[in-house]
Amino acid sequence: MGLKASLSLLSLTILLVFSKVVTANNITLAFQKYSKFSTMRDLFIKTKLIAAIDKYQTITVLAVSNDAISSITNRSEVELRNILMTHVILDYYDELKLQGMREKSIMLTTLYQTTGLGEQMNGFLNVSKSKGRVYFGSEVKNSPLNAEYVSTVYHNPYNLSIIQITMPIVAPGLSLAIFPPPPPYVHVAPYPTPMDASVVPAPGPAADDNSPDSAVPKTPPAPATDTPEADSPAPAPSADNEKIEAADKAKPSSSASKAGWSFDVILLLAFLASFAGF
């Protein structure tokens, strides 16, 4: 009995390990086999989700064709990772199980819910059946159920299933959960730079300078010159000064007349003396 129990335990361990390896490898192989899912395969590799999926033994991947998934390829790598995680269901579903649904609507847990960042049910999906058709959408309130089931691409019962849907599912608020708003920017005014007194600008004109008179340029004072006082016009002579000047002018005339008389007398005496000699 002990030997049989040991063999059973060993077989179970090998099966679990093998199943885990098959899950990771089959995801890559399944996407490589179908070229119409090459974009989604590249996104799974780019966002390093293959290793995260490898931790689970039972999953269902909602695959989207290259044309349909192009609507989200321009998002950031973090947003792409979150969106792709909502396309990984932590349960097994294939066409048989979907068509055999008893309830009209079922809530599904996705890989994104395991991150602890889920808000308002955006880590869950809703699958509903209506008139023989199956639709997927976010479990967030009022989210549309517009991703329709197309077909089962790959299935390994109760281990791995890859099913195609018509369009990607973008749950509201995924980016908000990853990118919290930054703290508000506080503007700090710079300290004023001390200025040297020599470079301080002169005060502006006073308020009175705004009057109309201030618009007329003022004539600067004439510079002082060394011009002698004689250059300035002489004052008008008074009556007394005129008399004195007239007297001064008359004196030379009197002297001249006296000198003339003396000369005549000398000539007369000389003439008389010449007669006396005879």
From Swiss-Prot:
Transmembrane segments: none
Propeptide: 256-278
Originating species: Arabidopsis thaliana (Mouse-ear cress)
Lipidated residue numbers (GPI-anchor amidated serine): S255
Keywords recorded for this protein, A-Z: Cell membrane, Glycoprotein, GPI-anchor, Lipoprotein, Membrane, Proteoglycan, Signal
Disordered: region residues: 199-257
Pfam hit, one: Fasciclin
Glycan-linked positions: N26, N74, N126, N159
Keyword presence, Secreted: no
Annotated ranges, domain FAS1: 25-169
Protein name according to UniProt: Fasciclin-like arabinogalactan protein 5
Free-text function comment from the UniProt entry: May be a cell surface adhesion protein.
Gene encoding the protein: FLA5
Signal peptide: 1-24
UniProt membrane topology term: Lipid-anchor; GPI-anchor
Record's keyword annotation contains Membrane: yes
PANTHER family the record matches: FASCICLIN-LIKE ARABINOGALACTAN PROTEIN, FASCICLIN-LIKE ARABINOGALACTAN PROTEIN 5
One GO location term (cellular component): plasma membrane
Basic and acidic residues bias: start-end ranges: 240-251
Cell compartment(s), UniProt: Cell membrane
Major subcellular site: membrane
Family: Belongs to the fasciclin-like AGP family.
InterPro entries associated with the record: FAS1_dom_sf, FAS1_domain, Plant_FLA
Organism lineage: Eukaryota, Viridiplantae, Streptophyta, Embryophyta, Tracheophyta
Extent of Low complexity compositional bias: 224-239
